[in-house]
């Protein structure tokens, strides 16, 4: 995963450096902007606990929504194709899941941090465009367990596809409306509690649907 993030960073720096070549004409094709996003997320969580050599398995599907801001920068290599990188400004935190056992509440939630997307926009007729990208995100767990244990933080990757409409003014200022869907790789975290009983949590079938309004300027 760290190698994947490094590759994204290298690609991002490479195309931004290319866009920033020391000549005024190099600014042409550069786009910067901000977005307001509203997303719905879903996934299936499965907890497996090893109790005296016997697995206790609990599985549950959940959904939640979130709104957040993001910034993006793009470079147009032609009238039809541009490459961009987008970074969430806000972390996304799941609702807290509470499980009462032995008259004690166990609470677990997760926060998606450093959500970064490297993407390509392909322009189509009637001011529309098709978006295809790859995602890298960190998943930090926050738990309060009666065993005193804790889960490790993890990270994951994903793919996103979307469609958008772009309206550009004469001065290069633009407004976009975009809808996209994302699919994330499965993740798992392990908790070795002081009582010696190992627990594993897997989150599978993670998906997201996002509607966004974007504003910016193209040079």
Stretches found by the model and what they are:
Residues 1-29, 219:
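Cleavable N-terminal export/targeting peptides
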Residues 6-8, 132, 177:
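Hydrophobic alpha-helical segments, especially transmembrane helices
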Residues 27-29, 36-42, 70-147, 152-159, ...:
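Gram-negative (and chloroplast) outer-membrane scaffold detector with strong preference
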Residues 39-68, 151-157:
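Surface-exposed strand-loop-strand hairpins of Gram-negative outer-membrane beta-barrel proteins
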Residues 47-56, 98-106, 145-149, 191-198:
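Disordered low-complexity repeat/linker domains
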Residues 55-57, 90-95, 159, 167-219:
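Predominantly the C-terminal beta-signal and adjacent terminal strand-loop region
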Residues 57-64, 105-111, 148-153, 198-204:
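Outer-membrane beta-barrel domain signature
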């Amino acid at each position: 995963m760290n190698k994947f993030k490094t590759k994204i960073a290298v690609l991002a720096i490479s195309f931004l450096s290319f866009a920033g070549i020391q000549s005024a004409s190099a600014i042409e094709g550069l786009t910067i902007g901000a977005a307001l996003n509203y997303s719905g997320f879903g996934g299936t969580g499965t907890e497996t606990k090893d109790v005296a050599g016997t697995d206790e398995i609990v599985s549950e599907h959940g959904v939640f929504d979130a709104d957040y801001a993001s910034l993006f920068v793009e470079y147009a290599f032609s009238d039809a194709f541009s490459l961009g990188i987008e970074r969430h400004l806000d972390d996304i935190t799941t609702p807290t899941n509470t499980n009462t056992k032995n008259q004690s509440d166990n609470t677990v939630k997760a926060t998606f941090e450093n959500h970064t997307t490297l993407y390509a926009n392909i322009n189509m007729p009637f001011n529309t465009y098709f978006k295809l990208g790859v995602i890298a995100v960190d998943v930090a767990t926050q738990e309060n367990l009666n065993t005193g244990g804790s889960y490790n933080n993890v990270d994951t990757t994903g793919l996103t596809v979307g469609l958008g409409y772009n309206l550009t003014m004469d001065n290069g200022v633009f407004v976009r409306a975009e809808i996209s869907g994302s699919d994330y790789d499965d993740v798992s975290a392990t908790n070795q509690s002081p009582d010696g009983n190992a627990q594993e949590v897997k989150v599978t079938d993670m998906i997201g649907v996002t509607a966004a309004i974007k504003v910016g300027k193209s040079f």
